[in-house]
Amino acid sequence: MLIEKIMGNIAHEEEHHEKKTEWIELEWEELSKRILRTETDQGTDIALRLEGDEPLKYGDLLWEDEHRRIAIRTKLEPVIVITPNDMHEMGKSAFELGNRHTPCLIENNEIIVRADHTINPLLDEIGVHYETTERRFKQPFKYRGHSH
């Protein structure tokens, strides 16, 4: 199936009571690809050829008929979710992650970083609560380069 345009976004209504949703699962880095050959989680062959330079987003609806729809979501990835108890722990966590140039997302009261075995001892040392789990990223990390 050739797909050349995005029809909408279903990020806020992932499940539909009348239509089956097939997912194209991508690494979040792949969201910027405009040409891609892949398949859905149900095995439907997909050729993606999009115009423009707007990146794909979690929930982008690529195809739909009366029985099913095909949309984008990111793959589950191993992450470390840090849950500081107060501003002191938040500050220590942010300082240490920033000092290492570790990209992070802040959602609700959590700091989320990609799993990295070198971060766990650091978090243990500063005494902040964290857990290693899996999540789907709904937005990309923002890398900010600089030089010393």
Curated annotation (Swiss-Prot):
InterPro entries: UreE, UreE_C_dom, UreE_N, UreE_N_sf. Its main location: cytoplasm. It comes from the Bacteria. Keywords: Chaperone, Cytoplasm, Nickel. One of its GO terms (biological process) is protein-containing complex assembly. It is found in: Cytoplasm. SMART domains: UreE_N (SM00988). GO terms for molecular function: nickel cation binding; unfolded protein binding. Pfam families: UreE_C, UreE_N. GO terms for cellular component: cytoplasm. Gene3D superfamilies: Urease metallochaperone UreE, N-terminal domain (2.60.260.20), UreE, C-terminal domain (3.30.70.790). Signal peptide: none annotated. Involved in urease metallocenter assembly. Binds nickel. Probably functions as a nickel donor during metallocenter assembly. Belongs to the UreE family. This is Urease accessory protein UreE. The gene is ureE.
